[in-house]
A protein has these predicted regions:
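A conserved short coil-to-beta-strand element within the FAD-binding core of flavoproteins
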Residues: 1-13, 40, 127-140
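Glycine/Thr-rich phosphate-binding loops of Rossmann-like dinucleotide-binding domains
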Residues: 41-43, 80-81, 86, 168-171
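Short glycine-/small-residue-rich Rossmann-like dinucleotide-binding loops
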Residues: 36-37, 147, 160, 164-165
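Core beta-strand elements of the Rossmann-like FAD/NAD(P) dinucleotide-binding domain
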Residues: 20-30, 149-158, 195
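Rossmann-like dinucleotide-binding cores of NAD(P)H-dependent redox enzymes
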Residues: 61-62, 67-71, 77-150
Length: 201
């Protein structure tokens, strides 16, 4: 079934809507949330994984086919790992990154050195690039980007979305309880307790 939090007497109660119909209410002194995460989607530009032409990280881990060309959007750990992996398998790979260097959380010197190494292996990079539209085509995907004010279009069989991870916190009742979130992630103290008594994450 699916679960939702509601206000309880001591701690929030968990209301489970059963697959076969009906509900089950669980009361406890403490409730631990372990909701997991999923790949972030950007539907406003057409970047939503479908497992076919637009892949999230899970699709890229267990592909149904081995495409010859890829556009990877995002050059953090996930994007770079898949770009490197599929290039090693012989695919042509272009990585698109919004800021002016790859691997943005790494030291700038590390980013520059890594990019040179990846380029020697044949990976292409478009840095400082804004993705404006991802469109599915008969042969794959078309990725429209802007680099330095100039529009470009990249074509590939598959686009890998590596634009981040988001917590599975939608629709589980956090807002109604007043649970504090930070960009969708549950805020906790040093004991993993949220701002709601008896609710941990």
């Amino acid at each position: 079934g699916t679960a939702k939090l509601e206000k309880g007497s001591a701690a929030p109660k968990v209301v489970v809507t059963l697959n076969k119909g009906g509900e089950r209410v669980l009361n406890a002194k403490n409730v631990m949330l372990a909701v997991g995460a999923r790949a972030r989607a950007l539907p406003q530009i057409g970047l939503e994984a479908d497992g076919d032409k637009i892949w999230a990280y899970r699709d890229a881990l267990a592909p149904k086919k081995l495409p010859k060309t890829f556009v990877v959007i995002g050059s953090g750990a996930i994007g770079i790992e898949f770009a490197s992996f599929y290039r090693a398998l012989g695919a042509e790979v272009t990585v698109v990154e919004a800021i002016d260097r790859i691997m943005p959380v790494e030291d700038e010197e590390v980013s520059k050195t890594a990019q040179k190494g990846f380029e020697k292996r044949g990976i292409k990079f478009k840095t400082g690039a804004k993705v404006t539209k991802v469109t599915k085509t008969a042969n794959g995907v078309s990725v429209a980007i802007e680099v330095g004010g100039k529009a470009e279009t990249l074509e590939a069989e598959v686009c890998i979305s590596a634009v981040g991870i988001t917590a599975n916190t939608d629709g589980i009742g956090l807002e109604a309880l007043g649970v504090e979130l930070d960009r969708g992630h549950i805020k906790t103290d040093s004991h993993c307790q949220t701002n709601v008594k008896g609710l941990y994450a």
